[in-house]
Amino acid sequence: MLSKEEYIEEIGLIEKQNYVEVELYPLVADIINPTLKNSLSKRYVFGRRKSNMGQIYYGLSNFPDIVILDKNYQNKARKSIEIEEWKKLRGCVEIKSLKHDLITEEKIKSTISNSFEHITGEMGQLIGDLLWYKKVIYTNGIEWRFLSLDDKEEIDNTIVQVVNKRIETEEAGNSFDWWKNIKDSSFNYTDIYLSKDCIQEWDEFVKKVKEIEW
């Protein structure tokens, strides 16, 4: 893992030389390496296009930036997803550009509790990631959060059914509103701050990261 000094230097160079989201990917990947046990793998899927090879990574709403997988997972073309294969997805990382304002916990809770008719954009991506991957690191390089969906067999079955319905509907050339099919379902999650400012709280931040269980 990068030292605090190395991380600060890289953040400064990003600001100075190439202020784009993708610059954070290797830094974030380095920070989360200690969370990967011998049985886990991290893969970059942000550049994938929606296809049968990528359906399981797209899930409900989008491709996250990094996914955490069981090492025994093997990707292949799929027109439907079996729950046994889905469970080999252990989590994901959603990275936003440096210092981008992250969606607050209050806004996420309000969206879910009010069952808004439609959700799009970053909110739709984040809630879709949470439901599909169950565990999400959400960061802008300074602020770091860890969202975790409570295990519940009923919602698991619903989510996989909705994704398979999305695949079928889109293959027929039609659009699909996944949120409309899930918004009335009951689910709980936690939203934990790993750090509001990882540079100012480095030691505590590193400690919390190392405690993450995928």
Write out the residue ranges for each language-model feature.
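Loop/turn residues immediately N-terminal
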Residues: 142-145
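A short, conserved, highly charged catalytic patch centered on acidic carboxylates
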Residues: 1-135, 149-214
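A structural signal for short, well-ordered beta-strand segments and their strand-loop junctions
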Residues: 136-140
